């Protein structure tokens, strides 16, 4: 087990402004030691000959290619709009201009 004791946990609790009882300090010392040991074993598992990866298997883009299809002209897009200005949709202001 990792060398994390009750005093280390109490110090971390003080730094984090967390109040912990004696029982909580003891239990947390054991739990943190297990976590540190687990992280240590994972870091030892990957050797220097293993390249860093973001995914365990190679991924390719599974989505379709972007293909330009039928598009509207500005006039067609704005034809059903209640109001427009300079080929843009005109909407009520939602923020004050200061």
Swiss-Prot record:
It is an enzyme of class 6 (ligase). The keyword rRNA-binding does not apply. Its EC number is 6.3.5.-. One of its GO terms (biological process) is translation. Keywords: ATP-binding, Ligase, Nucleotide-binding, Protein biosynthesis. Gene3D superfamilies: Glu-tRNAGln amidotransferase C subunit, N-terminal domain (1.10.20.60). One of its GO terms (molecular function) is ATP binding. It catalyses: L-glutamyl-tRNA(Gln) + L-glutamine + ATP + H2O = L-glutaminyl-tRNA(Gln) + L-glutamate + ADP + phosphate + H(+); L-aspartyl-tRNA(Asn) + L-glutamine + ATP + H2O = L-asparaginyl-tRNA(Asn) + L-glutamate + ADP + phosphate + 2 H(+). InterPro entries: Asp/Glu-ADT_sf_sub_c, GatC. Coiled coil: none annotated. It holds the Pfam family GatC. The keyword Nucleus does not apply. HAMAP family: GatC. Belongs to the GatC family. Heterotrimer of A, B and C subunits. Allows the formation of correctly charged Asn-tRNA(Asn) or Gln-tRNA(Gln) through the transamidation of misacylated Asp-tRNA(Asn) or Glu-tRNA(Gln) in organisms which lack either or both of asparaginyl-tRNA or glutaminyl-tRNA synthetases. The reaction takes place in the presence of glutamine and ATP through an activated phospho-Asp-tRNA(Asn) or phospho-Glu-tRNA(Gln). This is Aspartyl/glutamyl-tRNA(Asn/Gln) amidotransferase subunit C. It comes from Paenarthrobacter aurescens (strain TC1).
């Amino acid at each position: 087990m990792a060398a994390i004791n009750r005093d280390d946990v109490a110090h971390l609790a003080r730094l984090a402004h967390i109040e912990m009882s004696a029982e909580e300090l003891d239990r947390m010392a054991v739990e943190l030691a297990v976590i540190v040991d687990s992280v240590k074993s994972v870091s030892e598992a990957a050797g220097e000959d293993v390249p860093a990866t973001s995914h365990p298997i190679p991924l390719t883009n599974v989505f379709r290619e972007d293909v330009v299809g039928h598009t509207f002209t500005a006039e067609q897009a704005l034809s059903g709009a209640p109001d427009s200005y300079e080929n843009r949709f005109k909407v009520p202001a939602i923020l004050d201009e200061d």
